[in-house]
Amino acid sequence: MTSIAVCPGSFDPVTLGHLDIIQRGANVFDEVIVAVLHNRNKVPLFSVEERLELLKKATEHIPNVTIDSFNGLLIDYVKQKQAKAIIRGLRAVSDFEYEMQAASINKKLGPDVETFFMMTSNQYSYLSSSIVKEVAKYEADVSDIVPPVVAEALKAKFSSSPRNK
């Protein structure tokens, strides 16, 4: 039986920390579906379509990873994909409280689905998409914290709009 896991997130934009979790998940599961959330509560820098394309390019070297997007409850999406696992990265203890609540409700709504927490590698423990956007907004070099395709996209995004200094 094929083990399928879903790795959900906003990925606005995808960082090397995200890729670290995705790669490590792909080492454990037969198939990892990286699922971009349509989050109406956030105003994204990149559209869902742009994030899907950036993720496809950033993960093309990982054969057992597919990229998709979803609306609604994560657990419904996971069941639809016949996955048995959710992969979540944890940077710090501060992430754990929210992730534990989410895992608990997902377990209640989908008793057959397990949530796997992966600690972010130390070199990425400070990294978030929000920090990346803040640094990139001021046209600082982000090439050591995001995949090259994302660094190019950020540069294009911020050079085409007024700088907020």
Curated annotation (Swiss-Prot):
Cross-referenced InterPro entries: Cyt_trans-like (IPR004821), PPAT (IPR001980), Rossmann-like_a/b/a_fold (IPR014729)
Binding positions for substrate per the UniProt entry: S10, K42, L74, R88
Keywords linked to the UniProt accession: ATP-binding, Coenzyme A biosynthesis, Cytoplasm, Magnesium, Nucleotide-binding, Nucleotidyltransferase, Transferase
Keyword match Transferase: yes
UniProt entry tagged with the keyword Cytoplasm: yes
Cell location: Cytoplasm
Example of a GO cellular component annotation carried by this entry: cytoplasm
Known catalytic reactions: (R)-4'-phosphopantetheine + ATP + H(+) = 3'-dephospho-CoA + diphosphate
Protein name in the entry: Phosphopantetheine adenylyltransferase
Highest classification ranks of the organism: Bacteria, Bacillati, Bacillota, Bacilli, Bacillales
Gene this chain is encoded by: coaD
